[in-house]
């Protein structure tokens, strides 16, 4: 079972961990929310340290920079590829081909600029109000969305790509276990405050549903890029939803 944690750590982070990968990569999906918790705590700690400067904009920038470095920017890369493929291609085949191209196009650049702009604005307010729990919650829920999409959707490519090994064996139990982990973390981090929990879950549901429906329409399934993009968009939407409560 712990080999799944090793695979999850190696897939989602730059952290080097001992041990061997799981024979079935889908077993790592159970651990995605816990890896998200580790990333969230590290980034929230950096945000707290950054606030020693009394400059929330700088603290928010530390969160974004650490997120990129800790994850090798694989999820941001997925969002850029998704934007290029979904909005630059005319057919399913052309979209998949564009998404596989390592070059970043104009749609990808625009998507990344908007993503980091929205994240930075939201994080600036979050750290200014000392609401670090939102940083952790957004990162955990973003990994949970990846589990859901990998489990309920088919793989869009013909048996190729890194994500194929995760999607192939994914199913309902992966969602159930990941959901329990995510909900437990959310309740503890949010200190059982009902409204913030509901708002965060609604933002997650909206992000995951929209990404899934768009992927189903454009390429009839998911790829690693779709899973990465879903993570980035969920983080952004959860953090932006925090603003509703901060200014409520």
From Swiss-Prot:
It catalyses: alpha-ribazole + adenosylcob(III)inamide-GDP = adenosylcob(III)alamin + GMP + H(+); alpha-ribazole 5'-phosphate + adenosylcob(III)inamide-GDP = adenosylcob(III)alamin 5'-phosphate + GMP + H(+). It comes from the Bacteria. Its cofactor is Mg(2+). One of its GO terms (cellular component) is plasma membrane. The keyword Coiled coil does not apply. The chain crosses the membrane at residues 32-52, 60-80, 103-123, 134-154, 170-190, 195-215, 227-247. The keyword Hydrolase does not apply. It is found in: Cell inner membrane. GO terms for molecular function: adenosylcobinamide-GDP ribazoletransferase activity; cobalamin 5'-phosphate synthase activity. PANTHER family: ADENOSYLCOBINAMIDE-GDP RIBAZOLETRANSFERASE. This is Adenosylcobinamide-GDP ribazoletransferase. The gene is cobS.
């Amino acid at each position: 079972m712990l080999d799944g944690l090793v695979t999850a750590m190696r897939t989602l982070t730059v952290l080097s961990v001992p041990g061997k990968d799981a024979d079935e990569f889908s077993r790592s999906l159970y651990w995605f929310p816990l890896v998200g918790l580790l990333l969230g705590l590290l980034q929230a700690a950096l945000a707290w340290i950054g606030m020693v400067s009394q400059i929330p904009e700088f603290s928010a920038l530390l969160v974004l920079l650490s997120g990129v470095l800790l994850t090798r920017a694989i999820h941001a890369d997925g969002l850029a590829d998704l934007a290029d493929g979904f909005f630059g291609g005319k057919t399913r085949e052309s979209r998949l081909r564009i998404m596989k191209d390592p070059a970043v196009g104009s749609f990808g650049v625009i998507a990344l600029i908007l993503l980091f702009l929205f994240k930075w604005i939201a994080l600036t307010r979050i750290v200014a109000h000392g609401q670090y729990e939102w940083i952790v919650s957004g990162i955990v829920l973003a990994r949970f969305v990846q589990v859901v999409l990998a489990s309920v959707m088919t793989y869009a490519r013909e048996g190729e790509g890194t994500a194929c090994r995760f999607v192939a064996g994914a199913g309902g139990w992966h969602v159930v276990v990941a959901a329990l982990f995510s909900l437990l973390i959310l309740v503890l981090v949010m200190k059982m405050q009902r409204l913030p929990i509901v708002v965060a879950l609604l933002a997650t549901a909206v992000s995951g549903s929209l990404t899934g429906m768009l992927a189903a329409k454009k390429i009839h399934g998911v790829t690693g890029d779709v899973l990465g993009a879903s993570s980035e968009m969920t983080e952004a939407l959860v953090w932006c939803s925090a603003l509703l409560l901060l200014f409520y």
